[in-house]
């Protein structure tokens, strides 16, 4: 079977650094699904307005030339323990496919280059190919009693985020709120913990410079 993208994702993240590790972690992060020309037909979205969430099947396109292995080291385990690639959500997979649940914010049927699907809470970088879109169905897709393997035992680390007023003024209120949440999740690689190092993250067309000391992340400047 050969498959082609049906859409591409438009996101504030030009690179994968800083992209949330899972969908739904930054619930106010806005993104847009832009269908490819041959699928820009409003009929293909008929009835979508009756759903709140969508499943996106997409490609880890930044990893096209990366090697894969039957075992991986999940960041949540500190890179010290191996698990099977199919028992993980590692982006380094044989077929490079990702699966994300996103909330529908707005559907623009008559937009330029539309129809467009605006969504919240995605974990995709800008330009990510999307291969399928399906509605999220509560009775079939929700399993609150399910075990989550090693993830259950390793809570996410949340940081306090300090953003100077001069930096905050360069973003809209929505962009700033999402940026704070993204940074609070600590976008650094888990093995890096140098309080003197300044990291850079492309977000909404600007290079956000920050450093982390203890549990406090401070934005240094925006270029």
Each predicted region: which residue ranges?
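Mixed-charge, low-complexity intrinsically disordered regions
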Residues: 1-97, 109-223
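Conserved positions in beta-strands of structured domains
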Residues: 102-105
């Amino acid at each position: 079977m050969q498959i082609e993208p049906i859409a591409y994702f438009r996101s504030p993240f030009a690179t994968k650094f800083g992209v949330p590790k899972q969908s739904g972690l930054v619930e106010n992060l806005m993104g847009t699904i832009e269908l490819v020309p041959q699928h820009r037909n409003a009929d293909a979205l008929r009835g979508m307005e009756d759903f709140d969430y969508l499943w996106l099947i997409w490609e880890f396109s930044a990893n096209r030339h990366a090697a894969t292995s039957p075992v991986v080291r999940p960041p949540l385990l500190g890179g010290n323990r191996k698990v099977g690639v199919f028992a993980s959500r590692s982006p380094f997979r044989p077929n490079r496919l990702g699966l994300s649940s996103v909330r529908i914010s707005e559907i623009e049927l008559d937009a330029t280059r539309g129809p467009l699907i605006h969504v919240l809470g995605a974990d995709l970088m800008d330009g990510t190919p999307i291969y399928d879109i399906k509605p999220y169905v509560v009775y079939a897709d929700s399993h609150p009693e399910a075990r989550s393997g090693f993830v259950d035992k390793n809570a996410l680390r949340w940081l306090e985020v300090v953003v100077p007023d001069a930096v905050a003024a360069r973003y809209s209120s929505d962009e700033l709120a999402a940026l704070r949440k993204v940074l609070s999740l600590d976008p650094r690689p888990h093995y890096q913990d140098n309080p003197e190092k300044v990291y850079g993250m492309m977000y909404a067309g600007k290079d956000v410079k920050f450093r982390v000391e203890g549990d406090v992340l401070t934005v240094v400047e925006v270029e």
